[in-house]
Structure formats: C-alpha cells, structure tokens
Amino acid sequence: MSFFSMCVLGAAIGMAIGTLGTGIGQGLAVKSAVEGVSRNPGASGKIMTTMMIGLAMIESLAIYALVICLIILFANPYKDIALKLAETVAK
C-alpha cells in the first residue's frame, strides 16, 4: 500500500474515531440535561446554559480531529520524504 493510501486510510479512521467519541459524549450530555430539567424545571435556564458550554467543548474535539485529518491529507510533513523514497525505489 502506498504512502498516500495510508494517509487517506489514517485520516478516515481518525475522523471516524473522533466523531464517534464526540457523538456519544454529546448524546450523554443532552440526556443528562433533559433529566435535570425534568426533575427541576425551574433551573432549566442554568442547566441549558451549562449544557451548551459543555457541548461546545465536546464539539471542539471533533474539530481538532478534523484539523489533524486535513493536515495528514493536505499538509503532510512527510510527503517530501515519501516522494524521494519512492523515486529512489523506482530507479
């Protein structure tokens, strides 16, 4: 398998794992917030504000995973080394 194929595969797996974790985390956070509001409707404003801040922090993990995957795909620091190695192997 070539270097670039491995980069694409690594980015795909990294993004899948990153979004899976954040999706589960966001689901659990919303579940807990809804349970809290159902127990104490008077505190719904405070609970929702705290939940939104928490969801933003959880979502930042998915954004970091996306940035790392884009770096792997488009700005890979090892691209030049891999191309030189491929040229020497081809000769």
UniProtKB/Swiss-Prot annotation:
Membrane-protein topology: Multi-pass membrane protein
Protein name per the record: ATP synthase subunit c 2
Location in the cell: Cell inner membrane
Any one GO CC term of the record: plasma membrane
UniProt-listed HAMAP family: ATP_synth_c_bact (MF_01396)
Gene Ontology molecular-function annotations: lipid binding; proton-transporting ATP synthase activity, rotational mechanism
Protein purpose: F(1)F(0) ATP synthase produces ATP from ADP in the presence of a proton or sodium gradient. F-type ATPases consist of two structural domains, F(1) containing the extramembraneous catalytic core and F(0) containing the membrane proton channel, linked together by a central stalk and a peripheral stalk. During catalysis, ATP synthesis in the catalytic domain of F(1) is coupled via a rotary mechanism of the central stalk subunits to proton translocation. Key component of the F(0) channel; it plays a direct role in translocation across the membrane. A homomeric c-ring of between 10-14 subunits forms the central stalk rotor element with the F(1) delta and epsilon subunits.
UniProt KW keywords: ATP synthesis, Cell inner membrane, Cell membrane, CF(0), Hydrogen ion transport, Ion transport, Lipid-binding, Membrane, Transmembrane, Transmembrane helix, Transport
Protein species of origin: Pelobacter propionicus (strain DSM 2379 / NBRC 103807 / OttBd1)
UniProt similarity note: Belongs to the ATPase C chain family.
